């Protein structure tokens, strides 16, 4: 995100994510954390990692539920970043449902970006497809990065989000070399917007594969991922790579046919 006036972090954790944004020169940083004890313990035991970011002059702490915070104020952000606990924890799915993403859109600037951690392990393939497709219902451009075994969803409705930027926010020119860190980040892209678009097509009726406050699909489905007998991480990676490769084949006119849900979903 080249525009770095203000950002919101939902979930403090160890505080490292908030520190990264602070160190990358966001002018203002808001943090919404449900538990004051989390912040106190993180600063006590991980202060050398988070740099006590919660105490910085340009950082405001809000001890409240992240979704309620967005609901009860009208600030708009350049970036909203979320790295919560696993979806299957009670209540966490409220920040992965369609209504939440609708709310997030109203709290982002027109060129704003949502960044959200998503687990790839202990996640049944169909549940992961639900999650990605739910986000895509509200955001035109969606990427999935997998770095260090962790998934990160990046979403925006701005055409400018498809441009490539350096970590310092400057645009990548044709003759500009990426740093080694930036190259590793680019190598971590597992699904591009074209791949996510193709995913929606394979679902036949994408509006059905959506988790909402009314059906609570992710709330009740994701806990079952802890009991599967197969390697969910490996199967999910393979499924998503297959989707992305098929999407690329269609773009270059070299596809033998669509991958339908029954062929991309593993045991669930």
Predicted regions and their residues:
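The AdoMet/dcAdoMet-binding core of the Class I SAM-like
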Residues: 1-132, 136-138, 257, 265
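Soluble small-group transferase modules, centered on the S-adenosyl donor enzyme superfamily
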Residues: 1-8, 64-67, 72, 122, ...
């Amino acid at each position: 995100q080249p525009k770095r006036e203000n950002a919101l972090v939902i979930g403090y954790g160890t505080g490292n994510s908030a520190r990264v944004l602070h160190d990358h020169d966001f002018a203002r940083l808001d943090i919404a954390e449900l538990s004051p004890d989390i912040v106190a313990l993180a600063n006590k035991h991980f202060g050398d990692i988070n740099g006590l970011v919660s105490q910085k002059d340009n950082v405001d702490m809000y001890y409240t539920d992240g979704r309620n915070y967005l609901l009860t104020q009208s600030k708009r952000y350049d970036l909203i970043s979320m790295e919560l606990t696993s979806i299957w924890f009670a209540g966490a799915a409220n920040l992965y449902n369609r209504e939440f993403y609708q709310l997030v859109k109203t709290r982002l600037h027109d060129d704003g970006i949502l960044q959200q951690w998503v687990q790839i392990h202990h996640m049944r393939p169909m549940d992961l497809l639900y999650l990605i497709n739910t986000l895509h219902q509200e955001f035109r451009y969606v990427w999935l990065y997998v770095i260090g075994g962790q998934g990160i969803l990046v979403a925006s409705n701005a055409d400018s989000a498809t441009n490539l930027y350096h970590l310092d926010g400057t645009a990548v020119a044709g003759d500009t070399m990426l740093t080694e860190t930036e190259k590793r980040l680019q190598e971590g892209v597992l699904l591009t917007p074209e791949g996510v678009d193709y995913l929606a097509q394979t679902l036949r009726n994408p509006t059905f594969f959506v988790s909402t406050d009314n059906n609570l699909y992710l709330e009740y489905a994701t806990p079952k991922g802890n009991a599967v007998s197969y390697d969910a991480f490996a199967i999910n990676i393979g499924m998503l790579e297959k989707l992305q490769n098929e999407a690329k084949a269609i773009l270059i006119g070299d596809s033998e046919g669509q991958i339908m849900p029954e062929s991309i979903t593993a045991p669930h």
